[in-house]
Amino acid sequence: MNKPVLVSFLVSGDPNPDATLKFMKALDKYSGVIELGIPFSDPVADGPTIQAADVRALSNGFKIAKSFEVLKEFRKESDTPVILMTYYNPVFKRGIETFVMQAKEAGANGLIIVDLPLQEATEYREICKKHEMGTVFLAAPNTPEERLKISDEASTEFLYLISTFGITGARESFEQMTFDFIKRARTTCKGKICVGFGISKGSHAESLIEQGADGVIVGSAFVDIIKNYGDSEEALVKLEELAKELSEGIEKGYEKRNK
C-alpha cells in the first residue's frame, strides 16, 4: 500500500454468498483492499444501512463458515488484501485462535474486531502475531495522543481513523475536525492511516487523501447499491462505477498533495 488506496467494504452474505463473491470481483479492479464484514445480530458501530445488510444476510441463514468459503473462492482469482471485520462475540464463541487460524486458512490478510478495546486485546494480538494475521485498530477524533501512538503500533495493516463521532453512514461533507484529525495522526503515527465513516463520493476521497490519508474506507455507499439492486447485473455495474469514481478521487487527492 504505497500509493493511497480504496478500501471497499461489503457485508458477507448480503443478499447471498454467491452475490458477495460477484460483488468482490466487481470491486477488485479499483480496490487496494477489500473489507469483508461478518454479519452480526447487534452491530453497535454500524448505521442503519449496514445493520439492514446484516439482517438481510442473517435472515438468509448466513453462517461464519460461509464468509470463509466466499474468501477461499475469491482467493482463486485475486490476491488483493482482504480484511475481515467482525465483533468480539463471534470470535470469542469460536475461540480466538480457532477463528484466527480459520480466517488465515481462508486467505484473510487481517482482522478488525470493532468492539475489542486495545487494552483488552493482548491475547488476541499475540495469537494474530503467532499466525501472521494482520491487525487493524480504530481511533476517533478525541483519541488522546498516547493512545493514538499505541493504536498505531498495534495496527500492522493500517490504523482505522473514524472520520467523525457516531455510527457509519453516508454524509454530505466533512468538517474541519476530520482534516485536523488526519493531520494529527499523520504526525503521530508511523504506520498507514485510512479514514472511514461517511465517505460516498469521489470528492470526499479526494479531500481526505489530499489531507494526508493513505486510504479511504467506503462501506454504506456500496451496501446501499446492493440494497437497491440486489443480486443483479445492474448492481455489479453500479458498484464498479462508484469504485471507479472513488479511485479517481483518490488519484486527484494524491496529485494535489504532491504538488
Curated annotation (Swiss-Prot):
Keywords on record: Amino-acid biosynthesis, Aromatic amino acid biosynthesis, Lyase, Tryptophan biosynthesis
Protein EC: 4.2.1.20
GO cellular component: cytosol
Enzymatic reactions: (1S,2R)-1-C-(indol-3-yl)glycerol 3-phosphate + L-serine = D-glyceraldehyde 3-phosphate + L-tryptophan + H2O
GO molecular function: tryptophan synthase activity
Pathway assigned to this chain's UniProt record: Amino-acid biosynthesis; L-tryptophan biosynthesis; L-tryptophan from chorismate: step 5/5
Entry annotation: catalytic residues: E35 (proton acceptor), D46 (proton acceptor)
Disulfide bonds: none
Transcription regulation as UniProt keyword: no
Amino-acid biosynthesis listed as a keyword: yes
UniProt cross-references to InterPro entries, sorted A to Z: Aldolase_TIM, RibuloseP-bd_barrel, Trp_synthase_alpha_AS, Trp_synthase_suA
Known partners and oligomeric status: Tetramer of two alpha and two beta chains.
Protein family (similarity comment): Belongs to the TrpA family.
Physiological role: The alpha subunit is responsible for the aldol cleavage of indoleglycerol phosphate to indole and glyceraldehyde 3-phosphate.
Protein name as annotated: Tryptophan synthase alpha chain
Organism: Methanococcus maripaludis (strain C7 / ATCC BAA-1331)
